[in-house]
UniProtKB/Swiss-Prot annotation:
Chief place of localization: cytoplasm
Name of protein: DDB1- and CUL4-associated factor 7
One Gene Ontology biological process: protein ubiquitination
PANTHER family: WD REPEAT CONTAINING PROTEIN
Gene that produces this protein: DCAF7
Gene3D superfamilies, sorted: YVTN repeat-like/Quinoprotein amine dehydrogenase (2.130.10.10)
Subunit structure: Interacts with DYRK1A, DYRK1B and DIAPH1. Interacts with DDB1. Interacts with ZNF703. Interacts with human adenovirus 5 E1A protein.
Organism: Homo sapiens
The protein's role, per its UniProt record: Involved in craniofacial development. Acts upstream of the EDN1 pathway and is required for formation of the upper jaw equivalent, the palatoquadrate. The activity required for EDN1 pathway function differs between the first and second arches. Associates with DIAPH1 and controls GLI1 transcriptional activity. Could be involved in normal and disease skin development. May function as a substrate receptor for CUL4-DDB1 E3 ubiquitin-protein ligase complex.
Amino acid sequence: MSLHGKRKEIYKYEAPWTVYAMNWSVRPDKRFRLALGSFVEEYNNKVQLVGLDEESSEFICRNTFDHPYPTTKLMWIPDTKGVYPDLLATSGDYLRVWRVGETETRLECLLNNNKNSDFCAPLTSFDWNEVDPYLLGTSSIDTTCTIWGLETGQVLGRVNLVSGHVKTQLIAHDKEVYDIAFSRAGGGRDMFASVGADGSVRMFDLRHLEHSTIIYEDPQHHPLLRLCWNKQDPNYLATMAMDGMEVVILDVRVPCTPVARLNNHRACVNGIAWAPHSSCHICTAADDHQALIWDIQQMPRAIEDPILAYTAEGEINNVQWASTQPDWIAICYNNCLEILRV
């Protein structure tokens, strides 16, 4: 019997540790598969791959593997047709690309831009380009963003199939960079934005890296932690400040002036996810245990209230909207993952 036959609205999985990073698989043959990263304040951390058994309506842990330090982000290859190898990337001390098999997950490549030093500048985040899945971009506390190119080689025994090289590295901000995201504008391959501790949102073009555009600066110069592009209208993006209770919506055509502020949360916001299928819906999640869905189509008129609210049993660390199944949102809090039908 299918999920839709049962019409269950919420599925829950309890991990053996606090869940921080989390993301949906996008492969069409792995509908309810997610990756979860542990948050343990020591070297030894874990990543789990879990899947929903649609017969039993229970999440099953398919695979667990070790990861040095907590993952700051994890992402599956944006492969909606299932034509590329089944790859998962994680950021932490370095960017790692893993190959997921039926029984084991193995490290394909470790991308390290600092070959001459024992010191590594931790990566705060990364993004995987949807148009060109051979491109990834990382953000780091060393003020830089690095764009990586992956190569997939031929099978030669047990030689890793995937390797990578630095396409470009740029000093993106005056202080630490906390997030990076590719834009779908201009073909979707060359434009990306970053946010950081200097409180600015900056836009870059891989074809013209000699200059960047400041789209927004926080009035109090509070660090900006996250940015998220609208999936359907590349003019819009959302960002939030460290310890901030509101999410700011920006229009790149009107720099430095927010077109909306979403401020119903009662504690600091931790996550933002735009709807994959609609330009006017966005989900925000916060320490107030709430996940809120907003309809922003009346911008620039003020948006007073969300259209949907869900209260979890703990502070929500992360929210992800399933790109291939737009009626499902995943949240994590404490040691729990929940997927919610919206």
